[in-house]
Amino acid sequence: MKILVALAVFFLVSTQLFAEEIGANDDLNYWSDWYDSDQIKEELPEPFEHLLQRIARRPKPQQFFGLMGKRDADSSIEKQVALLKALYGHGQISHKRHKTDSFVGLMGKRALNSVAYERSAMQNYERRR
């Protein structure tokens, strides 16, 4: 155990001395010259500005993942309409949804009908008692 502690102390002391030797070569006026505008221009070359613009740009729409999962970048509305026409015939397709009295959201299944929701809440309360 004492050998491990001695090795750890030796390692820490040697890294501290090595870091001091490297730090001695630095310019002491580095921080005092920081506000010089010419040096700032040298520090921020064109590729760095280009990198910042690339980071700040908005991602493409196909890169977003919504709650329903990844969108297929190759699919388009025309392809989906053609598929629906093939499945349901060439008649007019109704785009209305069939609404029910409940929906499933992030918080679980919820009732749209307030009476049904209150009834289910009371049933859950009675079961817990």
Curated annotation (Swiss-Prot):
Modified residues (Methionine amide): 68, 107
One of the GO biological process terms: chemical synaptic transmission
Keyword Secreted: yes
tRNA-binding listed as a keyword: no
GO MF: substance P receptor binding
UniProt protein name: Protachykinin-1
InterPro entries: Tachy_Neuro_lke_CS, Tachykinin_dom, Tachykinin_fam
Compartment(s) where it occurs, according to its Swiss-Prot or TrEMBL record: Secreted
GO cellular component: axon; extracellular region; extracellular space; neuronal cell body; neuronal dense core vesicle; synapse
UniProt lineage: Eukaryota, Metazoa, Chordata, Craniata, Vertebrata
Family from the record: Belongs to the tachykinin family.
Role, per record: Tachykinins are active peptides which excite neurons, evoke behavioral responses, are potent vasodilators and secretagogues, and contract (directly or indirectly) many smooth muscles.
Keywords of this entry: Amidation, Cleavage on pair of basic residues, Neuropeptide, Neurotransmitter, Secreted, Signal
Signal peptide: 1-19
Gene encoding the protein: TAC1
Propeptide: 20-56
Positions marked as site (Cleavage): 59-60, 63-67
